């Protein structure tokens, strides 16, 4: 869903949920060019998501798209700082929000938002465990362990997680 679509995007959310059983939507602020907390740019679509009771997942942190390319292919990383989702979590306290990926280079900001807001969860996929910062591991094994999500096709046991960390 393009958050810039406003009312048309909100109608699309409702249609997809009601007619096709869609249970959530992924947003990629860097690729879609928006700040998640920009009320004018995307709150109409987010309001529809909240009303329909669906999960929202936001790409956070660096993206591989454009990495190393001239001008980063126009991708602006600033849009994917997880701190922008703090406002979204306040404004939509009943809407589940997932921070996709460890949010590098803003990992600690993502951890703070997930710890502070009960409706915010952290997805650990898309980043090799060997690059997880120690703070991320500490939070994942303690105060956020019930809010950490793993990509289903890459479920890691403790042993395989340790093995990947050592690689």
Segments the model singles out, each with a brief description of its role:
Residues 68-101, 109-110:
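Aromatic-anchored, glycine/proline-accented short structural segments
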Residues 1-67, 76:
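Active-site gating/metal-coordination segments in enzymes
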Residues 63-78, 117-119, 164-167:
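Active-site gating loops and adjacent loop-to-helix segments of metal-dependent hydrolytic enzymes
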